């Protein structure tokens, strides 16, 4: 079978070979491992074979976790802030000590190449270290011999953190763990497809923090509503699709819970006329196709200046032809499969729509995949601005290539998206100041990326609200308290 035939073949989601006795993971509630009566298989997307069994939490488990978190909060909030930071730093040490094991498990359950899995673990470690070193701001308004007034920050209480399948480990640790958390590791669509690594981390950190400070749950579609609708939850931090985010927001509104939503994006990169270089081509390529394009802040629309369009496109295609697509655990593979059958079907439907209307598809890459959810790197050459692959977030290895003439025009087209995550610009920084801050997005990058844990990020418009990471992300998990003391 040719690589092209292999790339175009749709895997049958019903044809799954069951391995002998895959290991079962357990929930973490109140510092203890908890088994369940029901389990779902965790599939390796490169082979579609089980690598383990995911426990399915019941409503009773949710109540147990909520009670454990509430009891822990009463004690944990009294621990000095500096001591809490030290314990968070200790989590980074645990991740470092088990990095190889966790990276291999992450590759097997998520699909990304092993080097990228190690990078995700390194990111989680950096987030722990960063959050464990951030000072909580305290503002003194008035201080005299007779009067003191100040504003301090205190932890909110029990938090539900909902983690997605594309970066389940790093995003889990973006959500500051120094606050008491009822941590849920399950997507409201299919929690079993990404729970293994974080369930394993839950097992590793049970003795690192007081019982109940972090509880790790996984399950099916029922788990999300049970957690987000619970009256004793003070805050929800959700990372996932805009569609599910709206459901979470409605659930939070019933009790006026604090809410952070990090949702989908249809991010654009802009390549100016002075950027026809191999370095820019490589940078733009990986901004779109890292993790097979399954990143909220990945480039999903590429605007290229008309004067270099054909030359830049051809360089991009030539670079893509050398990318090896296959099982991320194998040497030499630099791009893995789609993570699950649902996402595979979504991207295939967008590609099929281009074919049906007679659009030009350019398929690239060296396919070494088997029965997994593999797709070739696919460019759409000059689609209409209203085409589905331009308007919708593909969240896969599909990238529309578009022309533009001037900066004002392209900024208007970038801003036409309903989402507002990121705008990236492949231009020389010294010549890009004009217009750089005009995109209606929460982040703008110019020939660089978000490469430090201290930076905060988030969305606007349909990409959500609130902040993750950095000081701004930390403050999302706190509430202000103004203290006024009249001294005698």
UniProtKB/Swiss-Prot annotation:
PROSITE patterns listed in its UniProt record: ALDEHYDE_DEHYDR_CYS, ALDEHYDE_DEHYDR_GLU
Name the positions where NAD(+) binds.
240-245
Task: Enumerate the UniProt keywords alphabetically.
Answer: NAD, Oxidoreductase
User: Which Gene3D superfamilies does the entry link to?
Assistant: Aldehyde Dehydrogenase, Chain A, domain 1, Aldehyde Dehydrogenase, Chain A, domain 2
Q: Is Calcium among this UniProt entry's keywords?
A: no
Q: Which residues form the active site?
A: 262, 296
Q: Give the first-level EC class, as a single word.
A: oxidoreductase
What Enzyme Commission number does this protein have? 1.2.1.3
Source organism's superkingdom?
Bacteria
What are this entry's molecular-function GO terms?
Answer: aldehyde dehydrogenase (NAD+) activity
Has keyword NAD?
yes
Annotated catalysed reactions: an aldehyde + NAD(+) + H2O = a carboxylate + NADH + 2 H(+)
SUPFAM superfamilies recorded: ALDH-like
- Please name one Pfam family that this protein belongs to: Aldedh
Q: Give the protein's biological function.
A: Involved in an alpha-terpineol oxidation system.
Family (UniProt): Belongs to the aldehyde dehydrogenase family.
Listed name of the protein:
Probable aldehyde dehydrogenase
Provide the taxonomic classification. Bacteria, Pseudomonadati, Pseudomonadota, Gammaproteobacteria, Pseudomonadales
What gene makes this protein?
terPE
């Amino acid at each position: 079978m040719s690589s092209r035939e292999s790339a175009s073949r749709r895997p049958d989601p019903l044809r799954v070979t069951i391995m002998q006795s895959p290991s079962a993971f357990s929930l973490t509630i109140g510092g203890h491992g908890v088994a369940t009566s029901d389990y779902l298989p965790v599939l390796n997307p490169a082979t579609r074979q089980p690598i383990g069994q995911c426990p399915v939490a019941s409503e009773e488990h949710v109540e147990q976790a909520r009670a454990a978190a509430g009891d822990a909060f009463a004690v944990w909030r009294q621990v000095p802030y500096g001591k809490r930071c030290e314990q968070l730093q200790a989590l980074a040490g645990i991740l470092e000590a088990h990095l190889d094991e966790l990276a291999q498990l992450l590759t097997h359950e998520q699909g990304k190449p092993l080097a990228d899995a190690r990078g995700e673990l390194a990111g989680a470690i950096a987030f722990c270290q960063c959050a464990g070193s951030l000072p909580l701001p305290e503002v003194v308004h008035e201080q005299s011999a007779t009067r003191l007034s100040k504003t301090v920050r205190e932890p909110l209480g029990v938090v539900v953190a909902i983690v997605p399948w594309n970066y389940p480990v790093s995003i889990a640790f973006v959500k500051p763990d120094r606050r008491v958390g009822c941590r849920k590791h399950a997507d409201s669509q299919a929690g079993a497809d990404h729970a293994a690594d974080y369930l394993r981390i839950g097992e590793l950190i049970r003795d690192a923090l007081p019982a109940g400070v972090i509880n790790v749950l996984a399950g099916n579609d029922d788990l999300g509503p049970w957690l987000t609708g619970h009256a004793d939850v003070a805050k929800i931090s959700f990372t996932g699709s805009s569609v599910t985010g709206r459901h979470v927001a409605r659930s939070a509104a019933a009790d006026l819970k604090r809410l952070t939503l990090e949702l989908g994006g249809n991010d654009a990169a802009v390549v100016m006329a002075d950027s026809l270089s191999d370095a820019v081509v490589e940078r733009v390529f990986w901004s779109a196709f890292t993790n097979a394009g399954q990143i909220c802040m990945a480039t999903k629309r590429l605007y290229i200046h008309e004067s270099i369009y054909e030359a830049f496109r051809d360089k991009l295609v030539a670079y893509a032809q050398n990318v090896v697509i296959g099982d991320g655990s194998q040497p030499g593979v630099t791009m893995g499969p789609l993570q699950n059958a649902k996402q595979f079907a979504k991207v295939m439907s967008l590609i099929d729509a281009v074919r049906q209307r007679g659009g030009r598809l350019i398929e690239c890459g060296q396919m070494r995949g088997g029965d997994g959810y593999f797709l070739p790197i696919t460019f759409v050459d000059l689609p209409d601005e209203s085409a589905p692959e331009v308007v919708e977030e593909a969240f896969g290895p599909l990238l529309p290539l578009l022309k533009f003439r001037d900066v004002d025009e392209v900024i208007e087209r970038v801003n036409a998206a309903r989402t507002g995550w990121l705008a990236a610009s492949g231009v020389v920084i010294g010549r890009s100041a004009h217009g750089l801050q005009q995109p209606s997005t929460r982040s703008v990058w110019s020939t660089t990326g978000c490469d430090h844990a201290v930076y905060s990020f988030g969305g606007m418009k349909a990409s959500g609200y609130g902040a993750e990471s950095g000081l701004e992300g930390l403050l999302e998990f706190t509430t202000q308290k103004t203290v006024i003391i009249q001294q005698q």
